[in-house]
Amino acid sequence: MNYKEIEETLNQYNDWNITSISDDGRVNSQDSEGFVCEKINSILGITKIKTSNREKYDLYIKGGEDLKIVEPSSFTNTISFTKLAKMLNLKGNNNNSIFDSYQTKKNNGELKLVEDYVIVFLNKQTKKITIASLTELPEECIAVNPSNCIQTKIPTNRVERTQDEKFELVHNLFIDYINKRILTPAKNWEKLING
């Protein structure tokens, strides 16, 4: 089953039972994730495979998708700096190691998009699911946040991009985050990405 078929299958259900105990919507979403993931696994007949660095209730439909239970017009924290770096074929788990990897990969012409990031959005109002990769999202559904790297919101449509356009999108998000968050305290990036 491809993601479109999975989305259609899941949208036959509307009893997603989203918690609304807290005044904080993020808390309610997190409290609901376990139930929603278990229900998705049950509907799709998935025996969840827990890989390293996965939370108990993380989705694993095909490759570790990210479940977001959100209001239709709200941005939600989605992709960390290290995950964004990994998408671009970079190694490392902190600013310095990712900087070294970027420098090496850039000098060797090895910067490329090696994986996409799939998000399963559950709309709190309509109880409908939208499955989209980062590179399918329209630009107005993606924001760079200096504190949390990449935020996304539920798209009303998807964008088809070439492989080069997908790389440019992710690479530009990476650079935008560095310029907003890292560049001020770490000037060593400036010449490498902007010079």
Residue ranges and their predicted role:
Residues 1-55, 69-195:
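Nucleic-acid endonuclease domains
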Residues 59-71:
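Conserved catalytic cores of phosphodiester-cleaving nucleases, focusing on short active-site segments
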